[in-house]
Amino acid sequence: MSDILDRIIAVKREEVAAAMRSAPLEALKLEASARDLRDFVGALRAKQAAGHAAVIAEVKKASPSKGVLREHFVPADIARSYAAHGAACLSVLTDEQFFQGSVRYLEEARAACTLPVLRKDFIVDAYQILEARAMGADAILLIAAALDTPLMQDLEAYAHSLGLAVLVEVHDRDEMEQALTLKTPLLGINNRNLRTFETSIQTTLDMLDMIPPERMVVTESGILSRTDVDTMRAANVNAFLVGEAFMRADQPGEELARMFF
């Protein structure tokens, strides 16, 4: 695990301990039961069935490697723009310390449109999954580089028991083998190495031979142009998680349409 990932995971464990003291499980369960669910996997499949790219459009203010991506940051406006320009789903950063995200951003983005929403954070404990359900998320991210296989399987089972979809993220073939032990159809291949932050879309292409036909590859990071999109679609990769390219554009939704449609 990289130094930055080590630091993030350590902070997450501290955050979970603090959150459990301030918001007990029973209170969260009540909040979660009051939330409706949107079909995250179904939204992606519907786009693909129509012959379109299935885009998970990210609402992200900043990152540790790139700093602030967008100064004028209004999650509700961004979400509406994505929805109007063909996104299948949203991804919203809720990590505060490293990505300047917020639970409030997820709530605002989801309230502004009808798209299913992924809670983008570093999940290390089942408590965060219940939190995700309570804040209105429809899906969670599990990062193979941060979790051992038994824990990842347990977290997936708990997420599914709450009705949440799971996107499992990998960067290399060993992590892909780990991910393939899960039941989720959504296999995210992160083109960014979390150890070095180097990015190459070849990472996705090099792992396609491992993917069973019933699974859906979601290529993540480094998709910055129409050329990158065309390269992926030519290899039959039709689901994308994109943040930086949209966040740096004057009009995020228009940039989505320009790159994908």
Swiss-Prot record:
Gene this chain is encoded by: trpC
The Gene Ontology terms for molecular function here are:
indole-3-glycerol-phosphate synthase activity; phosphoribosylanthranilate isomerase activity
> What taxonomic lineage is listed for the species of origin?
Bacteria, Pseudomonadati, Pseudomonadota, Betaproteobacteria, Burkholderiales
Gene3D superfamilies annotated for this entry? Aldolase class I (3.20.20.70)
Keyword Isomerase among UniProt keywords: no
Q: Which reaction does it catalyse?
A: 1-(2-carboxyphenylamino)-1-deoxy-D-ribulose 5-phosphate + H(+) = (1S,2R)-1-C-(indol-3-yl)glycerol 3-phosphate + CO2 + H2O
Quick check: keyword Lyase in the entry? yes
Pfam families attached to this UniProt entry: IGPS
For biological process, the GO terms are: L-tryptophan biosynthetic process
**Origin species:** Burkholderia ambifaria (strain MC40-6)
Q: Which family does it belong to?
A: Belongs to the TrpC family.
Q: What class of enzyme is it?
A: lyase
This chain belongs to which protein, by name? Indole-3-glycerol phosphate synthase
Q: What is its EC number?
A: 4.1.1.48
